[in-house]
Swiss-Prot record:
Subcellular location: Cell inner membrane
Xref: PANTHER family: AGSS FAMILY TRANSPORTER, SODIUM-ALANINE (PTHR30330), AMINO-ACID CARRIER PROTEIN ALST (PTHR30330:SF1)
Protein name per its UniProtKB record: Uncharacterized transporter HI_0183
Keyword Cell membrane: yes
Keyword presence, Transport: yes
Source organism: Haemophilus influenzae (strain ATCC 51907 / DSM 11121 / KW20 / Rd)
Length: 481
């Protein structure tokens, strides 16, 4: 038997203490800022998630090829989707329902709908403020638009560190933990062996470079999503007459009050709302500041183009994939069991609908989902490591720490890694949401430029020389010549 590292046990105790003291106050602030920012951009952009939804489909589909070494819009979309479409759609939804009840699904919908406008804003800004490397590829994200747009290196570094801890360490621990739970339930695989295997296969990928990561994600994500959705549609079709009652239960339960624990607002909001918002943010990442890192890597003619593409990713993640998972769970007779939470709840629901095959099928699909999420998470975090200090030794150290946290998640308690993820993602989201609020005038300016060109019958193309006030802020304005 492979022994667990003593350090991982000590780390679990430290993380438990940190979460106990910080999670409540952090989520008080996060709920207010997350929903407030989403509503602000929804209103000030004239409900961009409705008006420009058809344009987002065009931008994604017709951006499948580009010359040079930068990512295509489609690859940037699927890299973002690799992180969005994963454990959050399967284990996250199940956890939300287990802890927050049926109504948590409604609040996941609300978070996604409002968050689509925040996702649009953050990814548009990431495109504008991106920089170009020597090999011709692009990189960027919140740290880049904070330091250029707000001229705050300290705030940018704080965000970069928060993202590194969230995606490089915490979220990858969650992904590994979920793989272990799924494979243990289906095939009785031991966590230690699964953890070591994940470390090996992750190492093979993360030393291959971001371009390679994008290619793998581009190939895997559509296939994974398609398989999972086909299975979901088959199950929903088998119970089509029961779906209206399930939707009614979701909406009705959303407004029943059962106070959530922790923080000032823990006594003012329901468990359904708290868990729906937490798991909704974990799943779709709208406004968190993660997707802009892949959005910045895309080669597009106008910043708004990639903002629309990433907005579409939020819709696909929550309104389609998460909803399918939720309905599958709520249609099963085993919903509400005290012993079934997270991945095991979803596996049990599938087993109820389609037999033993369901548990095995989900374990295989989740293995692919979670592994691709680890790849996408790493890509986000590496970009921010290079922002802080682009030194080979630091990148190497970071990669080794990523591998450690993958193993840590595989062998430690699910409650510990999920709570750790909740806490650090709240810090990351707060910093990013404040930044995009402060940069909102730039978002409006770019959107007006895009819409003006559409009305003139042109393919929108951003010319930085027409906006000298923006050219002065951007480090690499040659990109938009």
């Amino acid at each position: 038997m492979i022994m667990e590292f003593e350090f991982s046990k000590m780390l679990e105790e430290v993380l438990t203490w940190i979460v106990a003291h910080l999670d409540g106050p952090l989520w008080d602030a996060t709920i207010i800022i997350l929903l407030g920012t989403g509503l602000f951009f929804t209103i000030t952009t004239g409900f961009v998630q409705f008006r420009l939804f058809p344009a987002s489909l065009r931008e994604m589909w017709f951006g499948r090829s580009v010359e040079g070494s930068s990512l295509t819009p489609f690859q940037a979309f699927t890299t973002g989707l690799a992180s969005r479409v994963g454990v959050g759609n399967i284990g996250g939804v199940a956890t939300a329902i287990a802890l927050g009840g049926e109504g948590a699904v409604f609040w996941m919908w609300v978070t996604a709908f409002i968050g689509m406008s925040s996702a649009f804003a953050e990814s548009t800004l990431a495109q504008l403020f991106k920089i170009q490397d020597k090999d011709g590829s692009f990189r960027g994200g919140p740290a880049y638009y904070i330091v250029q747009g707000l001229k705050s290196r300290c705030m940018a570094v704080a965000f970069a560190l928060a993202l590194i801890f969230t995606f490089g360490f915490a979220f990858n621990s969650v992904q590994a933990n979920s793989i272990v739970e799924a494979t243990s339930n289906a095939w009785n695989w031991k966590g230690e062996y699964v953890g070591i295997s994940l470390v090996i296969f992750t190492a093979l990928i993360i030393f291959g470079g971001v371009k390679r990561i994008a290619i793998i994600s581009s190939n895997l994500v559509p296939m994974m999503a398609l398989f999972y959705l086909i299975m979901a549609v088959i199950i929903l079709g088998m119970h089509i007459d029961m779906i209206p009652s399930v939707i009614h239960r979701i909406v009705q339960s959303a407004f029943s009050f059962d106070a959530a624990a922790g923080g000032m607002f823990g006594a003012l909001v329901s468990k359904a709302m708290m868990m729906g918002i937490k798991r909704g943010l974990f799943s779709n990442e709208a406004g968190m500041g993660s997707a802009p890192n892949s959005a910045a890597a895309a080669h597009v003619k106008h910043p708004v183009s990639q903002g629309l593409v990433q907005m579409l990713g939020v819709f696909v993640d929550t309104m389609i994939v998460c909803t399918c998972t939720a309905v599958i769970i709520l249609l099963s007779n085993n919903y509400g069991s005290e012993t079934l939470k997270s991945i095991s709840l979803t596996q049990n629901a599938l087993q109820y609908h389609i037999g033993e095959f369901g548990a095995h099928f989900l374990a295989f699909i989740l293995l692919l989902f979670a592994y691709s999420s680890i790849i996408g998470n790493y890509a986000y975090a590496e970009s921010n490591i290079r922002f802080i200090k682009n030194k080979p030794w630091l990148v190497l150290l970071f990669r080794l720490m990523v591998l450690f946290f993958v193993y840590f998640g595989a062998v430690r308690s699910g409650n510990v890694v999920w709570n750790f993820a909740d806490t650090v993602m709240a810090v990351m989201a707060i910093i990013n949401l404040i930044a995009i609020l402060m940069l909102s005038p730039i978002v409006w300016k770019l959107m007006k430029d895009y819409q003006r060109q559409l009305k003139e019958g042109k393919t929108p193309e951003f010319k930085i020389d027409e906006y000298p006030e923006l050219r002065k802020k951007i480090f690499d304005s040659r990109i938009w010549k």
